[in-house]
């Protein structure tokens, strides 16, 4: 009998290893090129994910850990009170609970990739204990990866701004982004109609911070399961987020349709924490979020109350109870969709993957070896009632405002193979994405989607350069990519400075030389441009008086 127990124990150990570890370390090879970029080879996608985790940890284990701590309510234990709001938010939106409850909605093949990535991270941590920032974070699990992605995408939907406004006793409203002329991303693609030869060009020109959780990490992933992609990813992500394989490539820029809503609950006048929707009473679910402050370097745990309603996570301030609702709260498949995009081999396959409708937002610029170019202002956009102004607080006392459906991929602004031969985006309006007569029309889309309608300096200059050249060869393509010139007239989306160039310098003797230098400037920025330096002085000084420019935000020399 003892022999049978011994054999059974061995079988169980073998079964455990087969079931829980899909990784053969000997199959993984990490080869770094002259720039240090890891080229990671493996038999399976899971093994490549293990290698990606290892290589990224070698280069920046700290940022990966900080990212995972943020999504799993542990960042304040490491950083103290300055990270407490982040931990509070991750718990209010229930990152961990949602990732746990929805984890099995992920495809088993992608779950293997997550398993491989976590094995790589945990093995690195095991062999480098002095680099571990917070022991409680480990072991990393697939659910913890998903929880961080869930948190990150909630923030990318600008829903955190609504939460912050509620906490600060402000009226939370949709605020269009107005700084995309000072930072942002660009993408553009040309097919053979524009290149004049059998060539298709795609510019991937994303602008991310140089460090931190949203800084790019470049890698090349190759498996025998159909993965062969070179591109960039974020800390803790198990696949490439923007890049190119041997068939196609895509880039992202940030877009700004209205993806998050805030509701004012109608509270029962007598019953505590009871709200009323269409005459029916509902009880708020009261919960506690825990976070840390440090006293003499020792973490001390505190708690703060939050609630959930049928609309979503709910907070109380001096004005009442407010709920926030955004599509990322109900879906965890975004990273799986990116992984599938890594492996796409044709436009049809790529487009069908987009139909998963799991990415919460982001413009996509696309090109492939079959001369297909494509642009879409992508997103998981809710279908809302037209009778409400969704840029403001909406009533939380009716099911008419409780949206549950989303626009499908085919219903979003997009352009496929325009006759002009080009598509482009620079964080501006999706209704200005190719030649004028081929653009999507804003009137064809619900106003509740609240898509951007503006141009900016980068989009204006980009279109100028494209239209100046009937044919764009590769040399011209690169010149456009590296262009550093502002358009004439200026096209900031948040202020109009053009009157500056109409001023008469002799009328302003105190700044005559400075003004003359600005007006003679060729609007090209480089390290040796005196005009660019003079304009920068004006730009940053006038910024201090931005609120005094009036509703038009138009610069007046006499203001």
Predicted regions and their residues:
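Generic signature of intrinsically disordered, low-complexity, basic-rich segments
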Residues: 5, 15-17, 121, 322-326, ...
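Internal mixed beta-strand/loop scaffold within catalytic domains of large alpha/beta enzymes
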Residues: 23-62, 161-426, 431-436
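Bacterial Sec-dependent N-terminal signal peptides
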Residues: 1-23
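Long, compositionally biased non-active-site segments enriched in small/hydrophobic residues and glycine
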Residues: 24-172, 368-559
């Amino acid at each position: 009998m003892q022999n049978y127990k011994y054999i059974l124990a061995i079988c169980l150990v073998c079964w455990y290893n087969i079931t829980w570890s899909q990784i053969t370390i000997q199959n993984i090879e990490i080869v770094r090129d002259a720039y240090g970029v890891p080229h990671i080879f493996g038999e399976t996608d899971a093994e490549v994910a293990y290698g990606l985790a290892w290589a990224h940890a070698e280069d920046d284990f700290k940022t990966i850990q900080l990212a995972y701590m943020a999504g799993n309510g542990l960042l304040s234990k490491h950083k103290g009170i300055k990270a407490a709001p982040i931990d509070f938010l991750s718990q209010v939106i229930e990152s961990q609970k949602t990732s746990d409850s929805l984890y099995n909605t992920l495809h088993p093949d992608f779950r293997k990739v997550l398993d491989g990535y976590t094995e790589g991270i945990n093995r690195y941590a095991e062999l480098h204990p002095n680099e571990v920032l917070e022991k409680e974070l480990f072991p990393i699990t697939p659910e913890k990866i998903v929880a961080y992605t869930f948190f990150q995408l909630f923030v990318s939907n600008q829903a955190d701004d609504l939460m912050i406004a509620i906490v600060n006793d402000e009226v939370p409203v949709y605020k269009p982004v107005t700084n995309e002329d000072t930072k942002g991303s660009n993408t553009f693609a040309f097919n053979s109609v524009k290149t004049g030869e059998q060539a298709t060009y795609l510019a991937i020109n994303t602008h991310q911070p140089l460090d931190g959780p949203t800084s790019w990490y470049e890698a090349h992933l190759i498996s025998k399961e159909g993965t062969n992609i070179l591109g960039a990813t974020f800390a803790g992500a198990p696949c490439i987020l923007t890049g190119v394989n041997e068939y196609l490539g895509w880039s992202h820029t940030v877009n700004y349709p209205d993806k998050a809503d805030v509701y004012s609950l109608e509270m029962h006048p007598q019953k505590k924490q009871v709200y009323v929707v269409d005459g029916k009473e509902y009880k708020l679910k009261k919960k506690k979020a825990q976070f840390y402050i440090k006293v003499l370097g020792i973490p001390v745990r505190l708690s703060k109350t939050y609630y959930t309603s049928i609309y979503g996570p709910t907070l109380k301030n001096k004005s009442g109870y407010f709920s926030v609702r955004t599509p990322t709260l109900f879906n965890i498949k975004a990273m799986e969709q990116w992984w599938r995009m890594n492996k796409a081999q044709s436009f049809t396959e790529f487009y069908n993957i987009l139909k998963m409708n799991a990415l919460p937002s982001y413009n996509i610029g696309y090109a492939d070896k079959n001369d297909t170019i494509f642009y879409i202002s992508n997103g998981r956009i809710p279908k809302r009632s037209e009778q409400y102004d969704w840029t403001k607080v909406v009533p939380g006392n009716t099911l008419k405002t409780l949206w549950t459906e989303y626009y499908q991929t085919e219903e979003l602004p997009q352009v496929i193979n325009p006759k002009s031969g080009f598509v482009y985006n620079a964080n501006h309006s999706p209704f200005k994405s190719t030649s004028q007569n081929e653009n999507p029309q804003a009137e064809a889309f619900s106003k509740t989607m609240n898509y951007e309608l503006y141009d900016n300096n980068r989009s204006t200059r980009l279109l100028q350069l494209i239209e100046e050249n009937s044919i764009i060869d590769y040399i011209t393509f690169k010149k456009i990519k590296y262009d550093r010139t502002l358009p004439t007239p200026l096209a900031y989306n948040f202020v109009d400075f053009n009157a500056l160039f109409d001023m008469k310098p002799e009328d302003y003797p105190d700044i005559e030389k400075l003004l003359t230098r600005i007006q003679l400037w060729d609007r090209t920025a480089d390290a040796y441009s005196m005009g660019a330096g003079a304009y920068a002085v004006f730009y940053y000084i006038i910024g201090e008086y931005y609120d005094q420019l009036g509703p038009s935000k138009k610069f007046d020399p006499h203001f």
